[in-house]
Design a protein with these regions (language model features):
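Conserved, well-structured core segments that form or line functional sites
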Residues: 1-131, 145
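Short, low-complexity, charge-dense intrinsically disordered segments
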Residues: 133-144
Length: 146
């Protein structure tokens, strides 16, 4: 996480799950973005095998599930996200009115940062991981504005 932006930061939690993050600042500044979910557009058959044929919307709707489905482990830690092992690419443009934001989840320890709206997702997307009550409220508020 202390490397230059544009690389993967992969770590192991709870003794059983990997988490995939995108390092997002200059070297020595520990900023990273946790990728909590994704909507598969290809490779879904292998994801089903890795996740033991869960319903498609449950294949990647959480950070641990995403890593299992994608075969992500510590070997990808530090990988260049413009390389050929793992990468992020533009797929479709999403209108800003379809992007919801709310507080992050699972960071009860973060005190002053716990309610910051630093979590973003596509509204009504079935692949989104769990949304907190505050996040759902923020999404409804955003929907009323559009």
């Amino acid at each position: 996480m202390y490397g230059a932006g544009g690389v993967a930061y992969v770590y192991f939690v709870y003794g059983m799950y990997y988490q995939f993050n995108v390092v997002s600042n200059v070297a020595d500044v520990p900023h990273a973005i946790l990728v909590r979910a994704l909507e598969p557009v290809e490779g879904i058959e292998i994801m089903r095998e890795r996740r033991h044929s869960h319903p498609d919307h449950n294949l990647t709707n959480g950070p641990g599930k995403l890593c299992i489905a994608m075969g992500i482990d510590r070997q990808l830690n530090g990988a260049d996200l413009l390389g050929d092992r793992v990468w992020i690419e533009e797929y479709e443009s999403v209108p800003s009115r379809q992007i919801a934001k709310g507080p992050r989840i699972g960071i009860d320890y973060a005190e002053a940062w716990i309610d910051k709206p630093w979590r973003f997702w596509i509204k009504d997307n079935s692949y989104v991981s769990r949304i907190s009550r505050k996040g759902a409220k923020a999404q409804r508020k955003t929907q009323r504005k559009t």
